[in-house]
Amino acid sequence: QFFDNDWNKTYAAFRLESETYPGLTARDGFYTKKEFIDLQKLAENVFVEIIPEIDAPAHTLAFSHYMPEIGSKEYGMDHLDLFNPKTYEFMDGLFKEYLEGEEPVFRGKRVHIGTDEYSNKDPKVVEKFREFTDRYIRYVESFGKQACVWGALTHAKGETPVKSENVIMSAWYNGYAEPRDMVKQGYKLISIPDGLTYIVPAAGYYYDYLNCKHLYENWTPAHVGKEVFDEKDPAILGGMYAVWNDHCGNGISTKDIHHRCYPALQTLAVKMWTGVSKSVPYEEFDKQ
């Protein structure tokens, strides 16, 4: 047993300095605001945009550890209580801290607001989730940013409208967001199918290292799970992979994570440029 077999007590951390909520920032490792700004500037110098994400209203255990009253008593403390006005006060303050001013901490054109894996057990909470999603899309837009979300609106199917125009959706699992329906609604998609592009180091599920040979020879961003769009479909903006460190204390170091990232990054970068065409066989690409 770990954490007394209580999910609400598991390890969680927010890794960016916060002056609005000083006790929120992790003490065992974090970026100061200046460090994060400098990192973004470094990326800009090589034409890379860092898109910061504050994931809510699920995956938010770090927030409810800091402010327990905004955690959901029904769905677990890693879910925010969407019926509590303090939840919105907290999230408004957090986003505002990094978005306001002439030189905001979040420098780029886009900000990801999360919206991943919230419970859909109750129709009433589904409508509140959709309301939350729409609210924070518009909130980050009010600071001049383009909003990005995780695909969840098939899982959270409901009546409350959620803004889709100029919104980018990370399409990770078709059961959560059916790709063609999302495109029909107006979203632009980033293809990140979990069964092909998820790395969870030394966990025993998903990939420890991506199957780069399979990706190189068979996959393009037009393949969103089992749905295959036309190559260069304007609704598909590109693709990506993810590294999720679900297990801490399992012997995986930062260097180990980098070792998993490099071949994945190299392979997907080539696929973003070339699509279905392959200038060299995989074996030759792998040697290079």
Regions found by a protein language model. Give the residues of each.
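Substrate-binding cleft of carbohydrate-active enzyme catalytic domains
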Residues: 1-143, 147
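Active-site beta-loop-alpha junctions enriched in small/polar residues
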Residues: 3-5, 55-59, 116-118, 152-155, ...
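Short, conserved beta-strand edge motifs with alternating hydrophobic and charged residues
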Residues: 17-18, 150, 190-193
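Structural preference for beta-strand elements that scaffold enzyme active sites
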Residues: 47-51, 108-112, 146-148, 166-170, ...
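Alpha-helical scaffolding within the catalytic cores
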Residues: 93-100, 155, 176-177, 224
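Short glycine/threonine-rich loop-to-helix capping motif typified by GTGT followed
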Residues: 119-132, 159-174
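Acidic carboxylate-rich catalytic motifs and surrounding loops in phosphoryl-/glycosyl-chemistry enzymes
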Residues: 149-156, 282-283
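Flexible, acidic glycine-rich loops studded with aromatic residues
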Residues: 159-167, 174-288
